[in-house]
Amino acid sequence: MSVEKAKAYWQLMRMDRPIGTLLLLWPTLWALIIAAEGTPDWHVLLVFVLGVVLMRSAGCVINDFADRKVDGHVKRTQQRPLPSGRVTAKEAIILFLLLGISSFLLVLTMNPLTIQLSFAGIVLAFIYPFMKRYTHLPQLFLGLAFSWAIPMAWAAQANELPWVVWFVFAINALWTIAYDTQYAMVDRDDDVHIGVKSTAILFGRHDKLIIGLLQLLTLVMLVWLGLHYQLGQSFYWSVLAAGALFVYQQHLIRHRQRELCFQAFLNNNYVGMVLALGLFVAFW
């Protein structure tokens, strides 16, 4: 394999842009920390960190495969490996299968409940990229896909799925819809032109308000989670920090400028990080 081909595969998996991996990793760590009520099992932690990297990469590959005929018409995505011809559709599918199989082999080291849950995760990862053609709610499907690691991680750590798992699942899904709508605001004009659907288009002039409401509901549910587990001040400080970051994001998107909307999206990495840190300290 040539250096250029390897570089194209690397870019196709978005290994040069880790934001998506981080946004998937943080809620996975939330689940592991809460399920373990502190430090998770090291084997489980390693499997899920590696699994997050592999599955996020697989998701990027199948997403670009699904979008290969439209990415060439969007300024931000014209130079991606598939529309630029550096990777063929067949090569992308083979890479997706290799990543998916590698992820599944990792899951096979977990308990039966986790293995059963993994099948739904694979389905969600595969269908999400195609939703933008059929519904204005692809961000909802991303919320489901990015949140599915939560019940899987919880099951791997505790071998059970109490109802609170789905509460944490909902928290992350709401947050994901909010930040992916910010991301969709970057491409809104191009998406309207080529017929791709998104919540940014659906919400229209109410986009900032609805993002704000989703963020507010996320914070309220986080506070309730802290009360349920009787967590200490460190967790509430992390929720307060997340709220401050949400306010900053609202400031960034106030004029709907592409670059600033993208910065708001990237800022969500810090939201996930401070919440993971707050949970870890609270359960320590």
Swiss-Prot record:
Annotated metabolic or biological route of this protein: Cofactor biosynthesis; ubiquinone biosynthesis
Subcellular location: Cell inner membrane
Keyword Magnesium carried by entry: yes
Cofactor: Mg(2+)
Single biological process term from Gene Ontology: ubiquinone biosynthetic process
This enzyme's EC code(s): 2.5.1.39
Membrane topology: Multi-pass membrane protein
Short name of any one Pfam family annotated for the protein: UbiA
Reactions catalysed, as given in the entry: all-trans-octaprenyl diphosphate + 4-hydroxybenzoate = 4-hydroxy-3-(all-trans-octaprenyl)benzoate + diphosphate
Top-level taxonomic group: Bacteria
Gene Ontology CC, one term: plasma membrane
One Gene Ontology molecular-function label: 4-hydroxybenzoate polyprenyltransferase activity
Keywords: Cell inner membrane, Cell membrane, Magnesium, Membrane, Transferase, Transmembrane, Transmembrane helix, Ubiquinone biosynthesis
Sequence intervals crossing the membrane: 18-38, 42-62, 93-113, 136-156, 161-181, 209-229, 233-253, 264-284
Role of this protein: Catalyzes the prenylation of para-hydroxybenzoate (PHB) with an all-trans polyprenyl group. Mediates the second step in the final reaction sequence of ubiquinone-8 (UQ-8) biosynthesis, which is the condensation of the polyisoprenoid side chain with PHB, generating the first membrane-bound Q intermediate 3-octaprenyl-4-hydroxybenzoate.
Family (UniProt): Belongs to the UbiA prenyltransferase family.
PANTHER family listed in its UniProt record: 4-HYDROXYBENZOATE POLYPRENYLTRANSFERASE, MITOCHONDRIAL, PRENYLTRANSFERASES
Name of the protein described by the UniProt record: 4-hydroxybenzoate octaprenyltransferase
Organism: Vibrio vulnificus (strain CMCP6)
Name of encoding gene: ubiA
